[in-house]
Each structure stands twice: as C-alpha cells, then as structure tokens.
Amino acid sequence: MIRTMLQGKLHRVKVTQADLHYEGSCAIDQDFLEAAGILEYEAIDIYNVDNGQRFSTYAIAAERGSRIISVNGAAARCACVGDKLIICSYVQMSDADARQHRPKVGYFEGDNHLQRKAKAVPVQVA
C-alpha cells in the first residue's frame, strides 16, 4: 500500500507579494524552504487562512533571509499581501515507511519570523 503523507509545512506565513503577471509559482525564502524540506520546483498546496481558498502551485526560491512569500501568476487572485498561509508539500511512501515518518514543520509569527521548527503537528485536544 502507498500512502500520501505530509512532508513539510510552513504554518502561518504572511504573503509579502502577489504578482499576477509573474510566471506562476510561489517564491519562498530559501531558509523557509530548507526549514520545511521543500525543494525548488516541488509541487505545493497552499491554504489561505484569511479567505479559505485552497490552491496548488510549485515552489521557487526567493532570496535567502528575505522573508519573502510571493504568490505569483493566476494564484495571485487567491491571496493578498498580508494574508496568512499554510504551505504544504506531500510525499508518497510505503505503509511501513509512513508509520515511521515525521514531517518537517516551521511555525511563523509576525512578519515571517520563524518561531520554531518541529517534527510533528501537535495533537489537538478538547
């Protein structure tokens, strides 16, 4: 059996740019890509916390240390500067590997300050 698992997640990053006329993609600070284990040109899903939109694109690298999150091309219609996003990548693996797998998660606050890194999403409690 093959399972699709969360590989990496950038939790609550803030959109710094939205460029409708740029060639597709989402530009992400290289430090952020590394924090979540996301590769340049990798498929990503984006969940907009502010408006509820969910869309897919691919990651490209933005300047290291810039804190840039730029939603480009048609996807720019799905996010505005200042919106909070959750950016995820997924990986497929065997059932046995999936049971041992832990995603790379980066938690952000303010103007895209990496607050902490984790190897799991916390258990939700009542």
From Swiss-Prot:
The keyword Cytoplasm applies. The active site is at residues 25, 58. The modification Pyruvic acid (Ser) is found at residue 25. One of its GO terms (biological process) is pantothenate biosynthetic process. It catalyses: L-aspartate + H(+) = beta-alanine + CO2. It is found in: Cytoplasm. It is an enzyme of class 4 (lyase). Substrate binds at residues 57, 73-75. Disulfide bonds: none annotated. Its cofactor is pyruvate. Pathway: Cofactor biosynthesis; (R)-pantothenate biosynthesis; beta-alanine from L-aspartate: step 1/1. It comes from the Bacteria. Belongs to the PanD family. Catalyzes the pyruvoyl-dependent decarboxylation of aspartate to produce beta-alanine. This is Aspartate 1-decarboxylase.
